[in-house]
Amino acid sequence: LERLADLAEAIPTLRRIVLDPIVETPRGTLALSASVHLREAPVECDERASHLTVAPASRVEEVWSAGDRTLTLRALRENDFFRLEAFLDRLSDETKFLRFHTRAPITQAVVSELTQLNYDLENAWGLFEGDEIRAVVRWSADAEGLSAEFGVVVEERFQRLGLASRLMRHIEAEVFSRGVGRLSGLVLRENAGMNRLMTKLGYAANESDEPDSLVWSKTLRYKDFS
């Protein structure tokens, strides 16, 4: 295990190593098979070993301008539950439908999912104006951490300011830094604005199991973030 840790420290492009199966022998533990998975990243470690540094999501904040307004981007936390609930309540029925693909009321369970997160595999970011949330973007990776799904929603009077585009680029960079190589999202065919945004950001559309939706996907590459 120490040698595997040394490899992870020395080689930034190393995504994961799988040793399977592992059996016990009279002389100790033996791995009968192994595989190595790489990601797009420099092969050599920089002086700061930056590939090993992950800032605590809850402490990262950015200040954005949107027209004449100043917004703060930060990760959602458990104590944001009521702020998030108020944000979702302010959305129109149509905006909620385009985001959640249902006309049913948004339950407290949905709100909890966005504030009680496993930061190893998911994150949700809110754009705050003072104490009020104006937009939310979320990503959630699969169990292996190789691909992730996204969702984004912006309050109506803050739409058409380029916020959704900036939020998408923010999570693209974040998930790529975590080793995720592909980002995908399910978008209703009737959501013309989101479908245009996906095209603008370089996503490719594929048919979905749901006839009223498209799956937009993008392969994330090191050159896009270097």
Question: What residues fall within each predicted segment?
Answer:
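Phosphate-binding loop/pocket of nucleotide- and phosphate-handling active sites
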Residues: 35, 40-43
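Conserved metal-phosphate-binding beta-hairpin within the catalytic cores
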Residues: 13-36, 150
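A long amphipathic alpha-helix within ATP-dependent nucleotide-binding catalytic cores
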Residues: 1-19
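Long, contiguous binding/interaction regions
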Residues: 42-226
